[in-house]
UniProtKB/Swiss-Prot annotation:
Keywords: Cytoplasm, Glycosyltransferase, Phosphoprotein, Purine biosynthesis, Transferase. The keyword Glycosyltransferase applies. GO terms for molecular function: hypoxanthine phosphoribosyltransferase activity; xanthine phosphoribosyltransferase activity. One of its GO terms (cellular component) is cytoplasm. May act as a xanthine phosphoribosyltransferase involved in the synthesis of purine nucleotides. Such activity is however unclear in vivo. Pfam families: Pribosyltran. It comes from Saccharomyces cerevisiae (strain ATCC 204508 / S288c). The keyword Glycosyltransferase applies. This is Xanthine phosphoribosyltransferase 1. Its main location: cytoplasm. The lineage of its organism: Eukaryota, Fungi, Dikarya, Ascomycota, Saccharomycotina. The gene is XPT1.
Length: 209
């Protein structure tokens, strides 16, 4: 893959993007009750944005992780991957533990975090499956009147046709938040770098620091 087809993103840039989005969320009075990170790319942004969402007098926002796999390694070299057609659930929420320690997700503000919205397939799956399981919990616990509000935060939204959609209620109410919309290039994140100094230098050269 040619270098002009890659975008290098630095930790510094990610830190600033999370800070800006956190200010936006707090200004809208939409501080989440729980953050759900999609592994592995959503883990670091989730942890960073939680720091910026801290509010005096309130507890830290708990972070839960779900594992969803869409990319497939072609085995050609260390960087070539292809986008899979099917979402594979490798890790999911323990609703029993959530109900015991967190009073479930019912009636909560939930923020799903991932690094990139590429084809939107993974995000669609995450939202759809969470909505189904929350609806089931509402029936079991007889809490049908309580609304759970799901939002999404991604660092980057690729400007390209999507293979899947998200609820209109989310898209039309500002609950889908992309810190930046970028061209359809291969995004190189710092947590994938073998040489972080070289990676940061390349990110600076592209203005992504």
């Amino acid at each position: 893959m040619a270098e002009n087809e890659r975008m290098y993103i630095s930790y510094n840039n990610i830190h600033k993007l999370c800070q800006g989005v956190a200010k936006h969320i707090l200004a809208r009075n939409e501080r989440p009750d729980i953050i759900i990170a999609i592994t592995g790319g959503g883990m670091i942004p989730a942890r960073i944005i939680r720091s910026f969402l801290k509010t005096k007098g309130q507890k830290n926002i708990p972070i839960q992780a779900i594992g969803l796999s869409l990319y497939e390694d072609l085995g050609l070299d260390n960087s070539v991957e292809t986008i899979g057609k099917e979402v594979i659930r490798t890790q999911w929420l323990d609703f029993g533990a959530l109900n015991q320690h967190f009073d479930s997700l019912i009636g909560k503000k939930v923020l799903i975090v991932d690094e990139v919205d590429d084809t939107r397939t993974t995000l669609h799956y995450a939202v759809s499956e969470l909505e189904k399981e929350i609806a089931e919990q509402q029936k079991v616990l007889n809490r049908m009147s309580e609304e759970t509000v799901i939002s999404i935060f991604v660092l980057h939204n690729k400007d390209k046709p999507k293979r899947a959609g998200l609820p209109d209620s989310m898209m039309n109410s500002g609950r889908y938040i992309a810190a930046q919309t970028v061209p359809d290039k291969w995004l190189c994140y710092p947590w994938d770098a073998e040489d972080i100094e070289e990676h940061t230098m390349l990110a600076k050269a592209q203005g992504h620091d």
